[in-house]
């Protein structure tokens, strides 16, 4: 399962992301496995993802933000995560927030939760989304003492799924993430079917975000691209 760490090694987990659904796509399996073991998991969303639509007339920010909060609550129930915090920043604006403000909010969470492990984005934000990349900056600056694990893509998986990921349209830049060799990953999970099924059920609890993906990918492709969760130690 893992060349280094196992989920049991992670202790109390603070999982910090930009938008509701980031955590489920990138760490839903880790979080649900930890909860199954009785570990404390606190999930944090910096924004409500209220601008995450190509149709703002049908989905104005107030409406979409409320829907995404409700969807996120449903997804957290599926994963067994009972503690979910919202930082209340506006979606799409994190890069313009004074860095000291963002770092201070993360520091408050670290002081409150006292996690053994923090999960978040790597510097590339996985998709080069500016909000994702900003969260990495805040968390890395604030994080001291706890183990910091940043979401990555295993090199072999990236090579096999490159065309699918391009078709999915997840990248927000001409840049692409570099695959990480398995032996360099701190935590590498290939989710077994029960865990993957739970993760997919959590994703399906967020139809405002997942239905566009399922319009592009086949069910088998969507299942495959969500089976692995990988992290590097920073």
Language-model region placement:
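Active-site rim/loop-helix segments in enzyme catalytic domains that contact anionic ligands
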Residues: 1-114, 141, 232
């Amino acid at each position: 399962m893992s060349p280094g760490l196992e989920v049991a090694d992670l202790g109390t987990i603070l999982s910090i992301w930009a938008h509701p659904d980031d955590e489920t796509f990138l760490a839903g399996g880790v979080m649900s496995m930890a909860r199954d073991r009785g570990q404390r998991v606190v999930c944090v969303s910096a924004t409500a993802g209220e601008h995450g639509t190509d149709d703002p007339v049908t989905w104005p920010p107030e409406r979409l933000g409320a829907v995404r909060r409700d969807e996120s609550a449903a997804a957290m129930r599926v994963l067994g995560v009972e503690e979910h915090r919202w930082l209340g920043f506006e979606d799409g604006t994190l890069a313009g927030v004074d860095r000291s403000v963002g770092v201070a909010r993360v520091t408050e969470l670290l002081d409150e939760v006292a996690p053994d492990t923090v999960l978040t984005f790597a510097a590339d934000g996985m998709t080069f989304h500016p909000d994702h990349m900003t969260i990495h900056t805040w968390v890395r600056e604030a994080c001291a003492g706890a183990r910091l694990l940043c979401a990555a893509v295993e090199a072999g998986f990236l090579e096999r799924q490159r065309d699918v990921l391009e078709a999915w349209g997840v990248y927000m830049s001409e840049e692409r993430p570099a695959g990480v060799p398995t032996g360099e990953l701190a935590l590498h999970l290939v989710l077994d079917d029960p865990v993957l099924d739970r993760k997919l059920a959590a994703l399906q609890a967020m139809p405002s975000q997942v239905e566009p993906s399922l319009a592009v990918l086949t069910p088998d492709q969507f299942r495959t691209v969500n089976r692995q969760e990988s992290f590097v130690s920073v």
